[in-house]
Design a protein with these regions (language model features):
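Short, well-structured alpha-helical interface segments that form or flank functional binding sites
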Residues: 94-97, 109-112, 137-140, 153-160, ...
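Polybasic, low-complexity binding patches
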Residues: 148-159, 163-197
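Mixed-charge, low-complexity interaction segments
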Residues: 1-82
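Short, charged surface segments at domain edges that flank catalytic/cofactor-binding sites
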Residues: 59-121
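Catalytic cores of phosphodiester-bond-cleaving enzymes
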Residues: 36, 42-44, 48-53, 102-107, ...
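Histidine-centered nuclease catalytic patch
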Residues: 115-160
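Generic structural signal for bulky hydrophobic/aromatic residues embedded
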Residues: 33, 117, 164-165
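Sequence-level detector for tyrosine residue identity
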Residues: 3, 65, 102, 112, ...
């Protein structure tokens, strides 16, 4: 999907943050989403050491790299997806139109599901997690359809996922993880470990 140029994305990024505040989204949650979208994770060992740097300031060979424009688009997309969670606050039409233009579809409250486990995600849980964080843990993560993709932090490869879903997927593509789960369930039945009677 084509997105606006960098200057327009910056304007829309600021408009999105203003819309979030107007919808009653707590500042700590806005900062949390901004950190996930714009900054690298903490990786203090190994080949690609990072610690919350702006994604566009690190080497493009780093798996956590994203252009500034892509990182800001991802922020807008993640926020738009959040308004499809159960219990998400209502959005005024003007703000809704902004988020929908980046999502490429209409926002339908209460319809968002984790792409692997198909569990519904809940705004209150996301909000509470941001307001009362536990070091090293968050209930919802940014997931990647293909975590092995050379440039993985791009708008069409990013979505909200549960922490468990991210753990199960690991370094598999979403499709590979789904097939793996089906095979796993099949083995349980084959070995008599499950019976649905």
């Amino acid at each position: 999907m084509p997105y606006p140029d960098r200057e327009q994305v910056r304007l829309d990024f600021n408009a999105a943050k203003k819309a979030l505040r107007a919808a009653g989204v707590p500042p700590k949650l806005i900062i949390s989403i901004e950190t996930k979208a714009l900054r690298t994770g903490r990786k203090l060992t190994g080949e690609h050491v990072t610690n919350r740097q702006s994604r566009w300031t690190i080497s493009p060979t780093n798996p956590q790299y994203a252009s500034e424009c892509d990182a800001r688009v991802i922020f807008i997309i993640l926020c738009g997806m959040m308004f499809e969670f159960d219990n998400a606050p209502a959005l005024p039409q003007e703000a809704k139109s902004l988020f929908e233009s980046y999502l490429g579809k209409s926002i339908e409250p209460g319809t968002y599901r984790d792409a692997l486990l198909l569990e519904k995600l809940d705004y209150y849980r996301l909000r509470d997690d941001a307001l009362n964080p536990q070091h090293g843990y968050s209930i919802y993560h940014i997931g990647h359809q293909d975590p092995t993709r050379a440039r993985r932090h791009v708008p069409n490869n990013v979505a909200w996922r549960t922490s468990r879903s991210n753990l199960i997927q690991g370094n598999m593509t979403l499709r590979e993880a789904r097939i793996y789960l089906i095979k796993l369930i099949g083995r349980y039945f084959e070995l008599g470990e499950l019976d649905i009677k």
